[in-house]
Amino acid sequence: MIEVKPSQAQGSVRAPPSKSYSHRALAVSLLCEAPSKIENISRARDVIATINAIKSFGAKLSDNLTEIKIEPPQRPSIPDDVIDCGGSGTTIRFFAPISTLTEGGYTVLTGNDSLRRRPMGPIIDAINKLGGWAISSRMNGLPPLIVRGGGLKGGEVEIDGSISSQFFSGLMIASTRFERGLKIKPIGELVSRPYLEMTKEVLRRSGSHVELNEEIKVEPVPPKGLEFKIPGDYGLAAFHMLTASVTGGKVIVEDLDSTVPQADYAAIDVLRSFGVEVQEVGSRVIVEGRPKRGSKLNLKDSPDIFPIACVLASFVSEISEIRGVAHARVKESDRVANMASELKKVGVEVKELYDGLVIRGGSPKGGVKLDSHGDHRIFMALLALAAATREGCIIEGEDSVADSYPSFLEDSMKLGIDVRYNL
């Protein structure tokens, strides 16, 4: 655990590489017909799981820490061992359909305790409906998963869209190698749709063809090869923007690119909705000014911003309503319940709804112990909260930041946040 003393964030910081684009670029590069080169790739623990996965399927990597070159196999090979996805839902949901592309045999995909509680039913059902074979080893729709190889012809499939868009992205990538391509029809409301735009962008750059309308159509055009510099991650950089705001500081975040699709660009709109001053100057975002008013938000398409919105709402006396995130209950933790419990510890009025929170904030009290519940995004949000209290707070679970942003605490301290270790 760590102790965060009252602090004010000041200075500049480079945005970490996008975790979402790193996953997509690596998965697509495995299926390319020619070598790929990826620059500025994330070194987060979740992305390392994806790097290890493409190696297990036969990709050969050359890594000089600035760029990774990927030599793909002719087709994904049968892994020699179980694919350990760690805590990465993206990894297991992308590589379950990719596992159908091996010449034969079976692939077993599993992960840590958190991952083994995350639902996989939609991707299991989709693979089976398309003529493949996939099961949950415990027959409960949760990992471990067992997937048979041999290839899929493709065709049409319906998928429940209410849990995660990762199922759709995984099928979009894998289906570039299906014999007939694929048409996917979402059932119900499709959450996190902007992430599909990110998947489409990577596939487009590699030479594949995707249509995103009410239905998703993927042509059977294998990716040719990918050269891609991973942009900065708006969603992760937004935690420094949050800290700047609630501590009354000023932070400049560099190396962001709003010209490529980014689901978590929504963080900029969320900050502004609370009255925070945000300037965008080229590749820089400048944030200063405390939150001034409550906000009513629907974060259906950007659930990872939910903890940030909750902390902003905690520092304004007006009521805020943050909804549309029922699917945030099945992330690395139940983010709705866990954010509610932690905000109550610092005296914030919270009403929990099935799909979000109603929050009346003010001046959260410090001097308490907060728990990140092993969730990296909750931890980063709580650090901002703790720094903005008069007494500071102790926070458990700092190791979780390695999942997405290994240098988060180091970067926070460079901005002036007083973090104490060895408690």
Curated annotation (Swiss-Prot):
The family database entries (Pfam families) matched by this protein are listed as:
EPSP_synthase (PF00275)
UniProt subcellular location: Cytoplasm
Q: Which residues bind 3-phosphoshikimate?
A: K19, S20, R24, S164, S165, Q166, S192, D304, K331
Recorded source organism is Korarchaeum cryptofilum (strain OPF8)
**This protein's name:** 3-phosphoshikimate 1-carboxyvinyltransferase
Enzyme class, first EC level, given as a word: transferase
Q: Which UniProt keywords apply?
A: Amino-acid biosynthesis, Aromatic amino acid biosynthesis, Cytoplasm, Transferase
Instruction: Name its pathway.
Output: Metabolic intermediate biosynthesis; chorismate biosynthesis
UniProt GO cellular component terms = cytoplasm
| Underlying gene | aroA
The record lists the lineage as: Archaea, Thermoproteota, Candidatus Korarchaeia, Candidatus Korarchaeales, Candidatus Korarchaeaceae
The chemistry this enzyme catalyses reads:
3-phosphoshikimate + phosphoenolpyruvate = 5-O-(1-carboxyvinyl)-3-phosphoshikimate + phosphate
